[in-house]
């Protein structure tokens, strides 16, 4: 909960710990490994039209200096649709998370009034059963599916978690 407290104290609009940080944590725990690997990025997402790209980078650098034990990756989801082919701007952080490439990566957590809040738009079956498959958003577009397939090859997740089941459709 310490990392979630740090994120909550940033007081960023619509902010979450998300994506690979949580996916990898779950897979590590279920595989009997240390939950948060030292080399893991901490994927922090937020949504605020009033925070520029440069301000986001400055915030990331500040966090890196204050908490050097972690590799912070802070992304304002206002700008991130441009990294996904044929994708309209996201409406909020949840919209962005729901359109990540893999269903098991579409996961986010935060503290809301000091209570854990989880967002799993596709449920937890894929992540707890070590299944990697594209989200509906990626399935509906050939260019996005090419990005998805390139990610599968690049990430080489089965080397770390050999029991993963990878689906490319």
Language model feature labels by segment:
Residues 1-169:
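Catalytic cores of the polymerase beta-like nucleotidyltransferase superfamily
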């Amino acid at each position: 909960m310490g990392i979630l407290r740090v994120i909550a104290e940033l007081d960023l609009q619509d902010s979450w710990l998300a994506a690979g940080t949580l996916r990898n944590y779950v897979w590590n725990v279920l595989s009997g490994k240390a939950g948060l690997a030292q080399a893991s990025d901490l994927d922090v997402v937020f949504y605020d039209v009033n925070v520029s790209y440069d301000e986001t980078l400055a915030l990331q650098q500040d966090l890196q200096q204050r908490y050097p034990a972690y590799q912070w990756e802070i992304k304002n989801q206002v700008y991130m649709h441009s990294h996904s082919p044929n994708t309209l701007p996201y409406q909020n952080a949840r919209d962005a998370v729901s359109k990540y490439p893999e269903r098991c990566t579409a996961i986010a957590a935060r503290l809301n009034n000091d209570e854990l809040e989880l967002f799993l738009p596709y449920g937890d079956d894929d992540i707890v059963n070590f299944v990697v498959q594209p989200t509906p958003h990626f399935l509906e577009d050939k260019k996005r599916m090419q990005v998805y397939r390139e990610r599968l090859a690049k990430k080489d997740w089965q080397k770390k978690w050999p029991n993963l089941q990878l689906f490319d459709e």
